[in-house]
Amino acid sequence: MIREGGRPVAVLPVSLIDGLDPLGQLRGRYPLTGQELGLLSHVWHCYDAGLPELSDESCLRAAVGALRELARDQGAAWYGFVNVPHGSPLRAGLTGLGFPAVHIEDRFQLDLRGLDSVESYFAALPRSGRANLRRNRRRATEAGVSWQVRPAAEADLAEIGGLCAKTAARHGTGGFYPTDLFTGFVAALGDLAVAVEVRQGDRLIAAGVCLRDEIRFHAWACGVDYDVVGGFSPYPLLHAATVEEAIAEGRAVFEGGRGNHVFKLRHGLSRLALDACLLEV
């Protein structure tokens, strides 16, 4: 917490990570193995690093100084910020303080303004993306698939978390979803979290936990089981159902998370580059 005359002017959440590169996005870009101890902004699962209430360079300088001292006290090898939006004031401020800014991933967004239904979203897509989403919905319906959106606290969060963990394990990050921590955290969010569930019969084949803020609808975590019958893919179904809910709630922006570039670009999302800004302690 940065204070000026006793008044809070900036705040920086940080996390101490043993194995600072769980997604493999830093090694090869920085001289590290990925197993080092690091003190980083937010957590890797947050794709929107920032310094809330950042007002001027003195605030950032003070925050960076405190971050460096805390990293030293904790025995960290590296400190800094990950998932910093390219072109943001934070990135400009960090590079001005001597941090290198290295591109590590892209985040994807969809502007929902002017859309009043999921069909209007489909209609705005290029032919390939439009046909894919409509075809998947039709085939899935014929194969007995249904989907629903409800408050996350009312859903079976252990079941959803298990599917998310199974999906993440294919990329080496299954440990991101420990059952008790995941279910407790999501349930504690109350109305800020919703669950999107896709089932074939009674079997959960795709699910997502989405977060709301005042203007955005975030596709925060998801899992998919591709062992289905009927010639469709569950992931496009989950995506369409999630966008449909975001539109129904009147959100201005759909946050589609990181990665899966080909699918997201095909289906109308725009990319925003994310950088890492790290220094050795």
Identify the residue ranges that each predicted region occupies.
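Acyl-donor binding region in acyl/amide transferases
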Residues: 19-102, 214-271
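Short alpha-helix boundary/capping motifs
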Residues: 188-189, 267-275
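A conserved beta-strand-loop-helix scaffold within acyl/acetyltransferase catalytic domains
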Residues: 1-34, 78-231
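Acidic/polar loop patches that form or flank catalytic/metal-binding clefts of enzymes
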Residues: 171-175, 193, 251-256, 272-276
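Conserved catalytic-core motifs of GNAT/GCN5-like acyltransferases
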Residues: 102-110, 271-281
